[in-house]
Amino acid sequence: MAADLDPLTPAYEAMGVEGYYLAHGATYRNPHEDGVRGALTMAVATWTLDLSRVLDLACGSGEATLALRELGADRIDGIDPFTGVAYQARVGQSAEALRFEDIAAGALGGRTWSTVVCSFALHLVETSRLPGVCQALAEITDSLLIITPHKRPHIRSGWGWQPPVECKFQRTRARLYRRVGAESNSFGMASL
């Protein structure tokens, strides 16, 4: 049934995730863009998110970047090892070509973002690599917003993050994690 919900599942199964993006990264478009946009809009309306400097992690062709721009973010950096051509063509800026394993190894050390958004990608990280990626992200931001079509990934508090709060737009979930020990550990509610 998962294949019915995600049109990319058969391609991932046939080619592997990396193989798919190596073959199609330059022309990639997330088939769930409306869900990404809706979930981001709902997240910004529901929680107090600092959008002063955002990292769009696994930025694809810019689905989250474009939605975040519409929501008031104007300093957005993109990272994706496969879709840089598609991102550049669509949003007019380059994406840094880093892999999750590069991030786990400290490639982003010394840099900070107010919020990191990872849309439809963190659940694809190998389970053995996920703790290192999460711990590295906890060193560069206080807020991690994961946009996902399901309840994965499962991030443990020992990896640097508090249990999340969640909102849902249609079938797309927005899960906000705050870094353990962050200056503001609250999940402030936006004024409505």
Residue ranges, per PLM feature:
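Core SAM-dependent methyltransferase catalytic element
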Residues: T172-L192
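Conserved Class I S-adenosyl-L-methionine
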Residues: S157-R179
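Class I SAM-dependent methyltransferase SAM/SAH-binding core
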Residues: L55, S61-A105
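Class I SAM-dependent methyltransferase Rossmann-like catalytic core
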Residues: A2-L49
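A short glycine-rich, Lys/Arg-flanked "PGG" loop and its adjoining helix->strand segment in the class I
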Residues: P131-S143
